Design a protein with these regions (language model features):
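Catalytic alpha/beta core domains of metabolic enzymes, predominantly
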Residues: 6-12, 16-88
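Short, small-residue-biased leader/transition segments that mark boundaries at the very start
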Residues: 1-2
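Flexible C-terminal active-site loop/helix
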Residues: 65-124
Length: 124
């Protein structure tokens, strides 16, 4: 907590927060949590983490690891609930088999009007 109180930059728990039950023990120690679907396992658990974090007056970041467009499209569904978003994992893939919502050159995440997550398999 000493480091947090002296830092002008928000301190965000990443690997320490895998499920909603982790959030209460982090409250007061960090400013927020970084939610990654790869860590928590589902949109449902991610939403639980958001709700518990907000109940503890914490910030929420939606992040990713090295992820395909399919995984990022799912994570984008949580974007309206987040303070910060870092969903650029597909930009690092040479052979992402999916196409759909993507990171624009100006840094915006662009959703499309397709049904569901708006993701399709790239033609071969």
């Amino acid at each position: 907590m000493l480091f947090r109180s002296r830092s002008p930059i928000p301190i965000v728990a990443d690997e320490s927060c895998r499920v909603a039950a982790d959030v209460p023990r982090l409250a007061g120690c960090v400013d927020g949590v970084n939610i990654k679907l790869e860590k928590c396992g589902s949109l449902r658990e991610a939403l639980r983490i958001v709700h518990v974090a907000r109940a503890h007056h914490m910030k929420v970041m939606i992040g990713c690891m090295l992820s395909s467009t399919l995984a990022l499209a799912a994570a984008m569904q949580l974007a309206p609930l987040a303070d910060w978003i870092d969903l650029d994992g597909a930009a690092l893939l040479d052979n992402d088999p999916f196409q759909g919502p993507c990171l624009q050159p100006d840094g915006r995440l662009q959703l499309n009007d397709e049904p569901g997550l708006g993701v399709t398999v790239k033609p071969t």
